[in-house]
Amino acid sequence: MANEITEQEEVKCSFCGKPQSQVKKIVAGNGVYICNECIDLSKKIIDDELKADSIKETKDLPKPMEIKKQLDEYVIGQDRAKKVLSVAVYNHYKRISQMDIDSSGTELQKSNIALIGPTGSGKTYLAQTLAKILNVPFAIADATTLTEAGYVGEDVENILLKLLQNADYDLERAQRGIIYIDEIDKISKKAENVSITRDVSGEGVQQSLLKILEGTIASVPPQGGRKHPQQQMIKIDTTNILFIVGGAFDGIENIVKNRLGKKTIGFGAENGLNQVDADDWQKNLTTGDLVKFGLIPEFIGRIPIITTLDKLSTKDLIRILTEPKNALVKQYKKLLSLDNVDLEFTEGALKAIADMAISRHMGARGLRSIVENSLMDVMYRTPSEDNIEKVEITKDVITKHAQPKITYKENESQEASEAAK
């Protein structure tokens, strides 16, 4: 262990060569000595290198317009949400990179994000794509599985364990990752009236999430599950973890419309309600509306950025099927091409797939299962039948479960129903 030199003979710093009489302090190590001036200089060199690394990291960070452009390659529509997310994540990681080099004393607070939109509108996919663009660890949690500590269910700390696992247990990377908590609307307070039963999966979970959302040193069990006194914990600092929460918030538009449409008591109070367009409730959504829905003020206070996603139209879903880099149609085309089979979808088929997803209230989330079901027989047959050249999916395949049109390499074209026996 290093100790201050007190011997009578004068020693010299092993780094600069100055004797003890010319410096304030000299510390001895294992056969070497270092003076206070060299310690200060070493610290300055390290700080300068860290500052240079932080500046480089900031320069390498994609700008908001660049982030949105990359989001556009994978996510169709939702321009408002993409702009909000692009600015928010840019500011978040810029804040992190400047923390070590800012000497002004101005502390930049973390800004977590809430995404509000119907099922299948792209909330989870947006968060996933952001993490991919920024090359940071990402984890998804379902709020409905969480309970307050001490009750049956999953502790909120296990969300952090998922992030750590996805970062291959690289603690530094995990502490700069993104966590998406889905179905956040399902942990709203069960009722405004006081109940003798503790709300362990509603308000209790919101209370448990407060600290990790704001920034704390959380103790995480390395193998998951409940905490045990004798179990060694992993300490994770959540200060720089970006939390994105999402939910459908069914009925929130009525809360907004009622607030905007209310008039004071008097003539015309009942019949004079303002008409609120579909877009207006999204533009006028406030934190107060979310509190009215059932989120506690302390929870909302830790999620300052709120944006909404639109319900996807038939046109949007058709574009989702065909346009993004990893569009479903492109994926299945690639899959069948590995068996030397061309796959085509008619315009009628694409529209039928989109209409069916909307009718099932699944949005983009329902597209894959519809396409998968329509191609099941084809994917079963093509690996074994070498003479299949092309498969065409028509509207009837989607709506009436008809067989797709198959073209054979011998130029024999017939309905699959005639060929399959």
Curated annotation (Swiss-Prot):
Binding site for Zn(2+): C13, C16, C35, C38
Domain ClpX-type ZB: 1-54
Sequence positions that bind ATP: P118, T119, G120, S121, G122, K123, T124, Y125
Alphabetical list of Pfam families matching this protein: AAA_2, ClpB_D2-small, zf-C4_ClpX
Record keyword Disulfide bond present: no
Alphabetized UniProt keyword annotations: ATP-binding, Chaperone, Metal-binding, Nucleotide-binding, Zinc
A single GO molecular function term of this UniProt record: ATP binding
UniProt-listed GO biological process terms: cell division; proteolysis involved in protein catabolic process
InterPro entries reported for this sequence: AAA+_ATPase (IPR003593), ATP-dep_Clp_protease_ClpX (IPR050052), ATPase_AAA_core (IPR003959), Clp_ATPase_C (IPR019489), Clp_protease_ATP-bd_su_ClpX (IPR004487), ClpX_bact (IPR046425), P-loop_NTPase (IPR027417), Znf_CppX_C4 (IPR010603)
Cross-referenced Gene3D superfamilies: 1.10.8.60, ClpX chaperone, C4-type zinc finger domain, P-loop containing nucleotide triphosphate hydrolases
GO cellular component, one term: HslUV protease complex
Keyword Nucleotide-binding: yes
HAMAP family: ClpX
Subunit structure: Component of the ClpX-ClpP complex. Forms a hexameric ring that, in the presence of ATP, binds to fourteen ClpP subunits assembled into a disk-like structure with a central cavity, resembling the structure of eukaryotic proteasomes.
Free-text function comment from the UniProt entry: ATP-dependent specificity component of the Clp protease. It directs the protease to specific substrates. Can perform chaperone functions in the absence of ClpP.
Family: Belongs to the ClpX chaperone family.
Name the record gives this protein: ATP-dependent Clp protease ATP-binding subunit ClpX
Taxonomic lineage: Bacteria, Bacillati, Bacillota, Bacilli, Lactobacillales
Encoding gene per record: clpX
